[in-house]
Amino acid sequence: MSETKVVRTLTGVVVSDKMDKTVTVLVERKVKHPIYGKIIRRSKKFHAHDENNEFKAGDLVVISESRPLSKTKSWVVTGLVEKSRQV
C-alpha cells in the first residue's frame, strides 16, 4: 500500500528577492468571468524557499509545495524556466 503523494507545482515570476533564502513568486491564472464570460487574469503571491539565493527578480521559476518551512513559506523553488532579461 505504498501510495505516492501528488506534489502541486506552479510556474511564476520572481517579483522580490530581498529576503534571505526566500523569494516572492507571482503566479497568474486565467479565469472566465461567471456572468460576462470574459477571460480575466487572477494572480497570487507565494513565498518560496531559495536555499542558495540564486534566483533574481524577473526570473521565471517552477515552485512545488512542501512542508511548512515558516509561518508564510510552504513552497520550494525547484527549477528555472527562463532567466530575466536585463534592460
Curated annotation (Swiss-Prot):
Gene3D superfamilies in the record: Nucleic acid-binding proteins
Gene Ontology CC annotation, any one: cytosolic small ribosomal subunit
SUPFAM superfamilies: Nucleic acid-binding proteins
InterPro entries: NA-bd_OB-fold, Ribosomal_uS17, Ribosomal_uS17_bact/chlr, Ribosomal_uS17_CS
GO biological process, one term: translation
Record's keyword terms, sorted: Ribonucleoprotein, Ribosomal protein, RNA-binding, rRNA-binding
Keyword Ion transport annotated: no
Keyword Chaperone in record: no
Transmembrane segments: none
Molecular function GO terms recorded: rRNA binding; structural constituent of ribosome
PROSITE patterns in the cross-refs: RIBOSOMAL_S17
Self-association state and partner proteins as the record states: Part of the 30S ribosomal subunit.
NCBIfam families: PRK05610.1, uS17_bact
Protein family: Belongs to the universal ribosomal protein uS17 family.
PANTHER family: 40S RIBOSOMAL PROTEIN S11 FAMILY MEMBER, SMALL RIBOSOMAL SUBUNIT PROTEIN US17M
Function of the protein: One of the primary rRNA binding proteins, it binds specifically to the 5'-end of 16S ribosomal RNA.
Protein name, per record: Small ribosomal subunit protein uS17
